[in-house]
Regions:
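N-terminal and secondary-structure boundary signal
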Residues: 1-148
Length: 148
């Protein structure tokens, strides 16, 4: 298996310097995502919306930077994550959306719709083969993600 390329940026912002959303767009270009044909295609942007009451998630304006990039390249973006199998604020699509909104992820703040990828109860998924998987032979992927 080929090693993945990992791109880094300095999280510090200096006076009159680029902020993180601008740096994120530069990373997207460096990674070659602009070379993909996104024109007219649904683009699932997978991220973690955070649990209710915590701060361990990316800020919504970072998601918006990716959304703007996808739109500028003709794509139809939506933010997505799948429900959890454990109890909490993301165990079904309704509570998951309320959690996302509470943490600042709304269509107005991120610039695109938010879809929970595996449906209302987390049962709308597709089995996808894991090619070359030594221990795992298939993965369940949310249908909305697969449809994109």
């Amino acid at each position: 298996m080929e090693k993945a390329k990992v791109f880094f940026t300095d999280f510090r912002t200096k006076a009159n310097g680029d902020g993180l959303p601008t740096k994120l767009k530069k990373l997207i270009l460096k990674a070659g995502i602009a070379d993909l044909n996104l024109d007219g295609k649904f683009v699932a942007i997978k991220l973690h919306f955070g649990e209710m009451g915590n701060i361990s998630y990316l800020r919504p304006n970072y998601a918006r930077a990716v959304v703007e990039f996808v739109k500028a390249h003709g794509g139809k973006p939506f933010l997505t994550d799948c429900n959890t199998m454990y109890p909490g604020s993301r165990k079904n699509a309704l509570e998951h959306l309320y959690c996302a909104w509470e943490n600042g992820f709304t269509p107005m703040t991120v610039g695109c719709p938010i879809l929970i990828g595996d449906g209302l109860k987390g049962t709308d998924d597709v089995d996808v083969p894991v090619v070359g998987g030594e221990y795992v032979k298939a993965a369940k992927i949310g249908r909305a993600v697969m449809d994109a």
